[in-house]
Swiss-Prot record:
GO BP terms, alphabetized: defense response to fungus; killing of cells of another organism
Composition skew (Basic and acidic residues), residue ranges: 14-25
Protein name as it appears in the record: Antifungal protein 1
Species, as recorded: Passiflora edulis (Passion fruit)
Residue numbers spanned by region Disordered: 1-25
Length: 25
């Protein structure tokens, strides 16, 4: 899952990822 998560992060903007990370955390 870690590898897939990293790939998705690269694909999407970091701004949007920050929000996703918030939910994940």
């Amino acid at each position: 899952q870690s590898e897939r998560f990293e790939q998705q992060m690269q694909g999407q903007d970091f701004s949007h990822d920050e929000r996703f990370l918030s939910q994940a955390a």
